[in-house]
Amino acid sequence: NQGGHCAKGAALREHGHGEKRLKYPMKLEGGKWKRLSWEQAIEEVGSKALQIREESGPDSVYFMGSAKFSNEQAYLYRKFAAMWGTNNVDHSARICHSTTVAGVANTWGYGAQTNSFNDIRNSKCMMFIGSNPCEAHPVAMQHILIGKERGAKIIVVDPRFTRTAAKSDEYVHIRPGTDIPFIYGLLWHIFENGWQDESFISQRVYGMERIQEEVKKYTPEEVEHVVGVPKAQMYRVAKMMAETKPGT
């Protein structure tokens, strides 16, 4: 963190004392939010929960924890589920992070990030897809900006023009949900121009032939139709990634 506080930690007080924090229960009635007393909210939620348990059994309820829980909150939440009578209690990481670990392990052979912050600082080209470290990971952003000061090119691919995009050399505005067609569109240009790293592929990659066959469907015209990014920009980004090394 280069000796500085992480913005997330510095802003932690806002979780409990921020002006925008919800301070009382609200209920949606007739399309409008109505304020409730704590007593009424507890009564309504409790009565409905007990009705569900009586009619469908305790295992009909699924308790989903949060990464924002403190240790004490997580402990109490698990105890509450046990008191309720079910083992159906899980954590959001099971949905978001476990799938990442499996995917990354299958792709890179290691179930975690494959490069360090020092690699980012020394990178000459960085691409961010659906990633906004300026707000989501401020400590990482410090290292990214050091890399930029050293001459690294930054490419940000996102439906929104984020704060990270404001620091980019190339902002690519894609339609939501078109990340994979975008990647295949880049690969189309890379294969078309022979920019792929054959040495790396032969030593560390299997199944590339199947990828090449699939990529043939993602012509510049098809990608522009699906993703919304013109051929010239797709070519420019692919060329930048292929020729500016090392990259991440």
For each feature predicted by the language model, list its residue ranges.
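Active-site-adjacent structural elements in folded domains
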Residues: 108-114, 201-210
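Flexible, glycine/charged-enriched surface loops at secondary-structure junctions
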Residues: 56-60, 196-201, 248
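Membrane-interacting alpha-helical segments
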Residues: 188-208
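N-terminal export/assembly segments and adjacent metallocofactor-ligating motifs
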Residues: 1-193, 217, 222, 230, ...
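Active-site phosphate/pyrophosphate-binding segments
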Residues: 186, 204-248
